[in-house]
């Protein structure tokens, strides 16, 4: 787990642990050790929302049964946009290792760009018709996709309201 979490904050995390807490030790507290002060742990209350969410996703991928489907709403919520690559790499790596299908939602153009063109067959977007009904569309079936891609990235298409 630490190898996936290590690049997240400005100061590298070198170890992640959890310990039982509470009167009857029925709860757990998460701790991270960072390179800048390796003797002083940072508990979950001192971690950013993005770091906690990233760790939760790693734990979910490591503990879900193989051949499962893991749905993650707003996968990058709270995570700094500069960490999109680490998130995408972790999702691809752990889902492949654990044989888990991952379905994620996002509104982040940086994350879409990090997925890259090879992932186009796996990207969908949602539109609404004149009645307000939502429709899920495969990006690879988008009319004039090649022309849109020639003028920018997947994230740029989203920002420009083309998908």
Locate the predicted segments by residue.
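Residues at helix C-cap/C′ positions in short coil/turn segments immediately following an alpha-helix
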Residues: 9-12, 65, 98, 119
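C-terminal lobe/lid and adjacent interdomain/linker elements of RecA-like ASCE P-loop ATPase modules
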Residues: 86-163
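Bergerat-fold GHKL/Histidine-kinase-like ATPase
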Residues: 3-6, 14
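Conserved ABC ATPase signature
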Residues: 10, 14-62, 69-81
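Glycine/serine-rich loop-strand microenvironments at binding/catalytic pocket rims
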Residues: 4, 69, 95-96
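Generic hydrophobic alpha-helical scaffold/packing signal
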Residues: 2, 44-48, 56-58, 76, ...
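Residue-level preference for the first positions of well-ordered beta-strands
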Residues: 67-69, 101
């Amino acid at each position: 787990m630490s190898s996936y979490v290590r690049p997240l904050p400005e100061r590298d995390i070198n170890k992640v642990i959890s310990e039982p807490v509470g009167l009857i030790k029925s709860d757990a507290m998460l701790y991270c050790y960072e390179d800048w002060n390796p003797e002083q742990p940072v508990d979950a209350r001192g971690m950013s929302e993005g770091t906690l969410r990233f760790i939760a996703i790693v734990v979910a991928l490591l503990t879900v049964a193989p051949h499962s489907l893991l749905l993650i709403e707003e996968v990058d919520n709270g995570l700094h946009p500069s960490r999109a690559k680490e998130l995408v790499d972790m999702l691809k790596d752990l889902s492949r290792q654990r044989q888990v299908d991952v379905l994620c939602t996002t509104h982040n153009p940086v994350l879409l760009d990090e997925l890259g063109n090879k992932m186009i067959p796996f990207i969908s977007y949602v539109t609404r018709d004149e009645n307000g009904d939502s429709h899920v569309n495969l990006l690879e079936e988008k009319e004039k996709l090649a022309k849109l891609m020639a003028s920018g990235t997947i994230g740029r298409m989203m920002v420009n309201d083309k998908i």
